[in-house]
């Protein structure tokens, strides 16, 4: 299974999404693509911080459509993911390359479940051993 990072999900919500990302998504079987609860939190927090208005309403509508699409494919943050997250954060800090909690949680979910991560931010995850990365923004 491939988990789409928040930057990939937000690309799907854009007025004019990157055609390379759309082409990549079309090559992935729907049953093989999912999102995780951390992305749900990040997107909903971002939407909640936008000023009320037309733009926010449009994005919220697109988000609802995506949530409906992924409703049965949202990967949760569980005990194994939390344990992987702790190990990832320790390794990153020890190596002098601290990472955000959200990124570490996404990586922990992926690593504990054996999932690949589709992200634009390859460098943010490059030091996480045992994590397969895909950049859907590159041809």
Task: Describe the function of each predicted region.
Residues 1-39, 47-65, 139:
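Short, well-structured N-terminal submotif of metal-dependent ribonuclease cores
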Residues 5, 36, 98-100, 121:
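Histidine- and aromatic-rich ligand-binding microenvironments
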Residues 8, 39, 81, 106, ...:
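Alpha-helix capping/helix-boundary segments
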Residues 9-10, 41-44, 126, 134:
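Nucleotide phosphate-binding site architecture
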Residues 28, 70, 128-129:
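Short, structured coil segments at secondary-structure junctions
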Residues 45-53, 72-118:
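Active-site neighborhoods of divalent-metal-dependent phosphate/nucleic-acid chemistry enzymes
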Residues 107, 111-139:
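Acidic, PIN/NYN-like endoribonuclease modules and their adjacent C-terminal/linker elements
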């Amino acid at each position: 299974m491939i988990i789409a990072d928040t930057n990939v999900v937000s690309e799907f919500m854009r007025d004019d999404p990157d055609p390379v990302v759309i082409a990549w998504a079309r090559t992935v079987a729907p049953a093989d693509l999912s999102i995780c609860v951390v992305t749900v939190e990040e997107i909903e927090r971002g939407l909640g911080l936008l000023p009320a208005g037309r733009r926010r309403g449009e994005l919220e509508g697109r988000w609802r459509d995506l949530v409906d699409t992924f409703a049965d494919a949202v990967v949760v943050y569980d005990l194994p993911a939390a344990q992987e997250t702790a190990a990832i954060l320790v390794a990153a800090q020890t190596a002098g390359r601290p990472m955000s909690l959200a990124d570490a949680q996404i990586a922990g979910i992926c690593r504990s479940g054996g999932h690949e991560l589709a992200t634009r931010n390859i460098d943010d995850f490059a030091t996480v051993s045992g994590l397969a990365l895909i950049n859907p923004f590159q041809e």
